[in-house]
């Protein structure tokens, strides 16, 4: 038995970590596993809330969005790919069409971590590769990893958030996440995503 959430306003937040799209994805996954129509309907309701907010942000050229997984473009794109795969249709591709060019035109971030940084961008291209088997997507993920490694060699460190006196070794904001994602890029069929 699952207690269904009471709809509440999420302050027009379209991010994966704090917005409606992640809730929609959960219900669409439940529907896919159970074939229970109420989960599909709830997924659709939450997706419509997301899409309405998305259209408002689009009018403002996504000025409040960053490129992170949790609060930005990257998380939205990954969720869209997941929903498109579950729904087995192209209905949601307008979101990808609007946001992917922003991702492709971004410069390297000052952070290499999995939640907020450059290594997370590899996950979008690995998801695309997983669903399309387009080798160009896998190649793009490999290029991003190589760029991160090259900068690490120049700077003699990965660009991470550090607390004075402590190395950042955690999964989402530290070295563990970078290492895990590098393993995933080297073998995406065997190493599963931790961002979806």
Per-range role (PLM):
Residues 12-31, 65-82, 113-129, 170-184:
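Well-ordered alpha-helical segments within folded domains of soluble proteins
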Residues 20, 36, 73, 88-89, ...:
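Alpha-helix initiation and capping sites
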Residues 1-10, 38-59, 87-110, 140-157:
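Long, well-ordered core segments of solenoidal/helical folds
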Residues 82, 86-90, 94, 98-102, ...:
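Terminal, non-catalytic domain-edge segments
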Residues 10, 14, 37, 135:
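Charge-dense, low-complexity intrinsically disordered segments
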Residues 106-114, 125, 130-136, 140:
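Intrinsically disordered, low-complexity segments enriched in Gly and acidic/Ser/Thr residues
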Residues 31-34, 39, 46-74, 78-85:
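Alpha-helical scaffold segments of alpha-solenoid architecture
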């Amino acid at each position: 038995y699952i207690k269904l959430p009471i709809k509440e306003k999420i302050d027009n937040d379209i991010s994966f970590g704090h917005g409606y799209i992640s809730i929609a994805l959960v219900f669409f996954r439940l529907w896919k596993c159970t074939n229970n129509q109420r989960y599909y309907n709830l997924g659709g309701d939450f997706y419509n809330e997301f899409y309405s907010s998305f259209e408002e942000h689009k009018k403002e050229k996504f000025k409040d969005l960053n490129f992170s997984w949790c609060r930005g473009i990257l998380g939205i794109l990954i969720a869209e790919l997941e929903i498109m795969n579950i729904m087995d249709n192209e209905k949601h591709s307008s979101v990808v069409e609007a946001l992917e060019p922003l991702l492709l035109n971004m410069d390297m971030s000052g952070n290499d971590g999995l939640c907020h940084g450059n290594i997370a961008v590899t996950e979008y291209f690995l998801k695309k590769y997983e669903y399309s088997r387009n080798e160009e997507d896998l190649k793009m993920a490999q290029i991003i990893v190589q760029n991160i490694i090259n900068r690490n060699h120049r700077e003699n460190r990965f660009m991470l958030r550090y607390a004075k006196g402590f190395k950042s070794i955690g999964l989402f904001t530290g070295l563990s996440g970078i290492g895990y994602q590098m393993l995933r890029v080297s073998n995406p069929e065997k190493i599963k995503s931790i961002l979806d």
